[in-house]
């Protein structure tokens, strides 16, 4: 995950560290927002854009709402736990005090293939 400022400056990057850190909240999106918050000295990430490979889960989606992220761009949809339009859409829910502009499916086939091959490699299987 990469979080950028309105000017295009990279403010934070993140990778899934939940297993390594024994932290169920250490998803790539959360790690990128934590880094950006430290860089800005603020928990609000107003007008920033978050780029991720896979559609965020509910936890990450709500963290993005609380951080006031302006835009989300993701590659592959997540038909099991996607919370930004696939299974449900937390970031556009009018009951929240902030909504996020979403652009999903950007290079979606490539993102899906890369994710599949990553997990296949972890299981000792050849790439697709």
Model-found features: residue ranges?
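Immediate flanking context of iron-sulfur cluster ligation sites
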Residues: 42-54
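Histidine-rich, glycine-flanked metal-binding segment
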Residues: 7, 35-36
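Zinc-dependent deaminase
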Residues: 59-128
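Residues embedded in well-ordered beta-strands within globular domains across many folds
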Residues: 2, 49-51, 73
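A short, polar/charged loop-to-alpha-helix boundary motif
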Residues: 17-31, 35
């Amino acid at each position: 995950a990469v979080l950028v400022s309105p000017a295009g400056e990279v403010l934070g990057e993140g990778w899934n560290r939940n297993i390594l850190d024994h932290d169920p909240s250490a998803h790539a999106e959360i790690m990128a927002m934590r880094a950006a918050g430290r860089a800005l000295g603020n928990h609000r990430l107003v007008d920033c854009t978050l780029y991720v490979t896979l559609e965020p889960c509910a936890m990450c989606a709500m963290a993005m709402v609380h951080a006031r992220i302006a835009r989300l761009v993701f590659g592959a949809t997540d038909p099991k736990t996607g919370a930004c339009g696939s299974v449900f859409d937390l970031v556009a829910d009018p009951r929240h005090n902030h909504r996020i502009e979403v652009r999903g499916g950007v290079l979606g086939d490539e993102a899906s293939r890369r994710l599949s091959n990553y997990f296949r490699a972890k299981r000792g299987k050849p790439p697709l």
